[in-house]
Amino acid sequence: MVCTEERNMIMANGTKFSTGNHPVEMGLPMLHFINAGFDIEIVTPTGGSAKIEMWAMPEKDDAVLKLYRDYADAFENPGSLTDFAANSMTDDAPYIAVFLPGGHGAMLGLPDNPDLGKLLHWAHNRDLFTLAICHGPAALLAANKGEPSAYIYHGYKIAAFPDAVDRQTPLIGYMPGHMPWQFGEKLNELGVTIINSKADNSCHLDRRLISGASPKAANNFGRLAASTLLDVVRSR
């Protein structure tokens, strides 16, 4: 699971928005993976602590709260994606998927990270799954090598948080300014189609890429991803 280690997004008007990975979009899928018997290894670009949008923590969800207590040390002391890319991407590595959790923090330090680009290409070439929810698909941009037709997700369809909804968030007071850039627009330019127009519970499976649209999709996304991964394990 690749988390962000950056806290502040600089908005188009120069203000700062405190962000990170969204606790529901990350936590609910994690619970499904753990209940299905999978281990989760957490990394950030350099091994700095994973940043979480604690203001979005579901304070009445005991299972999610326990998850974050249990994984507190792993979030505070994650592995380094740089080290992982250098040492762990072997033919016999025991991984089945790469998880890119949501939160606006997924747009910070990941979309242009060369080590994440290597990881996504490695996973794609080994037929591993890639899982991304809400703003997590922004990190898929790391796999871009410059030619849209050669982009590994060219022609794919995904569910993701729509740019049009992000443009509305300052109007309702959710964010202090407009987004500095639109990740959906950049994915569209690379040949990716976003299937949903609302921040709803849409989930989508296209080949080995599983995606979800928003926090509303987190439970169904986690269920779809976990069941799909289990089907692969059982078929081996």
For the regions a language model picked out, list residue spans one by one.
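Active-site cofactor/cluster-binding pocket
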Residues: 129
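Short, thiol/selenol-centered motifs that function as redox-active sites or metal-ligating centers
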Residues: 132-137
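Extended, subdomain-level signal for the structured scaffold at the beginning of enzyme domains
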Residues: 1-126, 139-236
